[in-house]
Amino acid sequence: MTTTTTFKGVDPNSRNSSRVLRPPGGGSNFSLGFDEPTEQPVRKNKMASNIFGTPEENPPSWAKSAGGREDSESPGTQRSNSSEASSGDFLDLKGESDVHENVDTDFQASLAQVEEKPVPAAPVPSPVAPAPAPSRRNPPGGKSSLVLG
């Protein structure tokens, strides 16, 4: 004879039932068709539940290290973009403005030379003709039902 395991319902003193009626949280999951005031449990570590909302008061530690870099700098320090650094400009921290102007004029002169050169037009690629479809195609299994005489 085969026995089946049965589970208790919501009330532990009620008769045995084959359904599990109690949710993992322990509360009831019965819906009677009207809104009941329910209390949502407060989650301490919300990961991406409000990505468009206001930032959290206590972000996780990984968010502090990734997003906090810009905030951690003091307002007195100056930053330069990588494009500024590669163009030959530099920040004038010691008051050497005449050297900075010389670099600036040299840079503008080199830009003028670059602008005077005509840019060759990109060659237009010829349209690629699609491969011709074969006149006979085999079915996926490879076996053809074609009867040859």
Swiss-Prot record:
The gene is Jpt1. Signal peptide: none annotated. This is Jupiter microtubule associated homolog 1. GO terms for cellular component: cytoplasm; nucleus. Residues 1-19, 74-86 have a biased composition (Polar residues). Modulates negatively AKT-mediated GSK3B signaling. Induces CTNNB1 'Ser-33' phosphorylation and degradation through the suppression of the inhibitory 'Ser-9' phosphorylation of GSK3B, which represses the function of the APC:CTNNB1:GSK3B complex and the interaction with CDH1/E-cadherin in adherent junctions. Plays a role in the regulation of cell cycle and cell adhesion. Has an inhibitory role on AR-signaling pathway through the induction of receptor proteasomal degradation. Transmembrane segments: none annotated. Keywords: Acetylation, Cytoplasm, Nucleus, Phosphoprotein. The modification N-acetylthreonine is found at residue 2. Residues 1-149 are annotated as: Disordered. PANTHER family: GEO05313P1, JUPITER MICROTUBULE ASSOCIATED HOMOLOG 1. The modification N-acetylmethionine is found at residue 1. Residues 120-133 have a biased composition (Pro residues). It is found in: Nucleus; Cytoplasm.
